């Protein structure tokens, strides 16, 4: 497995590849959710490149950029064990050669980025589209793999690829859950044992909503009320029912509905969702 630290090294390596290339962009602190993306890429492509880069432009002033876990050696060991061909681990100066005021500014489309996570984390998705587009230019993948857990991010990336006419297939990957049903996240390491038990209200709320939908309930307000009753011990940022353009719904639309939740357990903010 190659560990590539510079753009020059990545470009040289990429030029040597003639068959399909799968790309899994990450911020490191890899878990079984990332592993599932990597394994799918390995299955569907001749070569797989993983990036490990904690992107500063998608963190707000009061967010956890400096505290974000960075177990690089562990991440590299997992990638090698899985059979990844190359891992791109650039420094910030490689990806952002100019100071902030000198950079070309990219903005996520407002109709997808102004609500939900975008409302809670101003500028977050602008930073996401900036780094993802840079990575796409460098890696030039056949396919790129993104988890459905970050649903709003996935929809924005799909829009980016279509809008900018990029010849890249975006492969959405199912949410991976731990044995207790909590959606896997690099931020789960922040939870102590008590907080982890409290956090289980999130998947329980979504499970209750899914059960109601399966029984025929279609009214979004009733579904949200069911979920909020279970989430009452947590600090809920939002529990929303939207279509795939992130427009609020009053009635469930089969195959075009997302139930999205963000809640805080202590200082840790967790996301989860249902694709209906």
UniProtKB/Swiss-Prot annotation:
Location(s), subcellular: Cytoplasm
Binding of ATP, residues: 27-34, 147-150, 176, 184-187
Gene Ontology biological-process entries: pantothenate biosynthetic process
GO cellular component: a single term: cytosol
Pathway assigned to this chain's UniProt record: Cofactor biosynthesis; (R)-pantothenate biosynthesis; (R)-pantothenate from (R)-pantoate and beta-alanine: step 1/1
Database matches in InterPro entries: Cyt_trans-like, Pantoate_ligase, Pantoate_ligase_C, Rossmann-like_a/b/a_fold
UniProt KW Ligase keyword: yes
Residues at the active site: 34 (proton donor)
Catalytic function, reaction form: (R)-pantoate + beta-alanine + ATP = (R)-pantothenate + AMP + diphosphate + H(+)
Binding sites annotated in the UniProt record for (R)-pantoate: 58, 153
Single Gene Ontology MF annotation: pantoate-beta-alanine ligase activity
Keyword set includes Cytoplasm: yes
S-S bridge residues: none
Keywords for this protein: ATP-binding, Cytoplasm, Ligase, Nucleotide-binding, Pantothenate biosynthesis
Residues where beta-alanine binds: 58
EC code(s) of this entry: 6.3.2.1
Protein family according to the UniProt entry: Belongs to the pantothenate synthetase family.
Miscellaneous: The reaction proceeds by a bi uni uni bi ping pong mechanism.
Its job: Catalyzes the condensation of pantoate with beta-alanine in an ATP-dependent reaction via a pantoyl-adenylate intermediate.
Subunit-level organization: Homodimer.
Protein known as: Pantothenate synthetase
Organism, scientific name: Helicobacter pylori (strain ATCC 700392 / 26695)
């Amino acid at each position: 497995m190659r560990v590539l630290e510079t753009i020059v090294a990545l470009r040289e390596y990429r030029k040597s590849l003639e068959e399909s290339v799968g790309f899994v962009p990450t911020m490191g602190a890899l878990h079984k959710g990332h592993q599932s993306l990597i394994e799918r890429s390995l299955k569907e492509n001749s070569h797989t490149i993983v990036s490990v880069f904690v992107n500063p432009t998608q963190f707000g002033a009061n967010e956890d950029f400096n505290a974000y876990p960075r177990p690089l050696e562990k991440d590299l060991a997992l990638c090698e064990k899985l059979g990844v061909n190359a891992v791109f681990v650039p420094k910030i100066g490689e990806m952002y050669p100019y100071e902030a005021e000198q950079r070309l500014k990219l903005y996520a489309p407002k109709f997808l980025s102004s609500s939900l996570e975008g409302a809670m984390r101003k500028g977050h998705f602008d930073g996401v589209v900036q780094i993802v587009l840079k990575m796409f230019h460098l890696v030039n993948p056949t396919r790129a793999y993104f988890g459905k857990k970050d649903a709003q991010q996935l929809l924005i990336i799909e829009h980016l690829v279509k809008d900018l006419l990029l010849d890249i297939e975006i492969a959405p990957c199912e949410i991976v859950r731990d044995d207790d049903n909590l959606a896997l996240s690099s931020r789960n390491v922040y939870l102590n044992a008590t907080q982890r038990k409290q956090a289980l209200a999130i998947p329980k709320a979504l499970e209750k909503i899914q059960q109601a939908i399966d029984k025929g309930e279609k009214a979004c307000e009733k579904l949200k009320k069911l979920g909020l009753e279970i989430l009452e011990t947590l600090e809920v940022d939002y529990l929303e029912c939207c279509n795939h353009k992130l427009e609020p719904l009053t009635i469930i639309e089969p195959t075009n509905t997302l139930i999205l939740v963000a809640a805080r357990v202590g200082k840790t903010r967790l996301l989860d969702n249902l694709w209906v």
